[in-house]
Amino acid sequence: MDYVSLLNQIWQKYLNSPYTTCLYIPKPTAKYTPLVGTSLHPVLWNCQLSFAGYTESAVNSTKALAKQDAAQRIAWLLHKDGGIPDGCSLYLRHSSLFAQSEEEESFSN
């Protein structure tokens, strides 16, 4: 699943909703920082993605992969919290879309 596209779709749906009032949410924004990597990937990328009051960071070997990882974390937070305040809700049908989080792992042990 392309989580960056999912966040963009949520943002567009939110802007086009007739029930959206008084709360402007800017589109998802990403900031990249290069990091020292490994011998296999000499440069790693830290992506800090912000959307709807959430900010998540992820590190990966390419900017695109780091952005996808950060977008997945924000999508999970939106799902967990019930969506954007005063607007769209996000309920995913299949929990298998997300890897098992640390929070879920602690309950299974």
UniProtKB/Swiss-Prot annotation:
GO CC, any one term? host cell cytoplasm
Q: Where are the transmembrane segments?
A: none
Query: Which superkingdom, per the lineage?
Result: Viruses
Keywords in alphabetical order: Apoptosis, G0/G1 host cell cycle checkpoint dysregulation by virus, Host cytoplasm, Host-virus interaction, Inhibition of host innate immune response by virus, Inhibition of host NF-kappa-B by virus, Modulation of host cell apoptosis by virus, Modulation of host cell cycle by virus, Viral immunoevasion
Its GO biological process terms?
A: symbiont-mediated perturbation of host apoptosis; symbiont-mediated perturbation of host cell cycle G0/G1 transition checkpoint; symbiont-mediated perturbation of host cell cycle progression; symbiont-mediated suppression of host innate immune response; symbiont-mediated suppression of host NF-kappaB cascade; symbiont-mediated suppression of host PKR/eIFalpha signaling; symbiont-mediated suppression of host type I interferon-mediated signaling pathway
Q: Where in the cell is it found?
A: Host cytoplasm
ATP-binding found in the keyword field: no
What role does it play? Answer: DsRNA-binding protein that plays a role in the inhibition of host innate response. Suppresses host PACT-induced activation of RIGI and MDA5 and thereby circumvents the production of type I interferons. Also prevents the activation of host NF-kappa-B. Inhibits the integrated stress response (ISR) in the infected cell by binding to dsRNA and inhibiting EIF2AK2-mediated phosphorylation of EIF2S1/eIF2-alpha. Stress granule formation is thus inhibited, which allows protein synthesis and viral replication.
Q: How does it assemble?
A: Interacts with host PRKRA/PACT.
This protein is called Non-structural protein ORF4a
In its UniProt entry, the species of origin is given as Middle East respiratory syndrome-related coronavirus (isolate United Kingdom/H123990006/2012)
- Whichever gene encodes this chain, its name is ORF4a
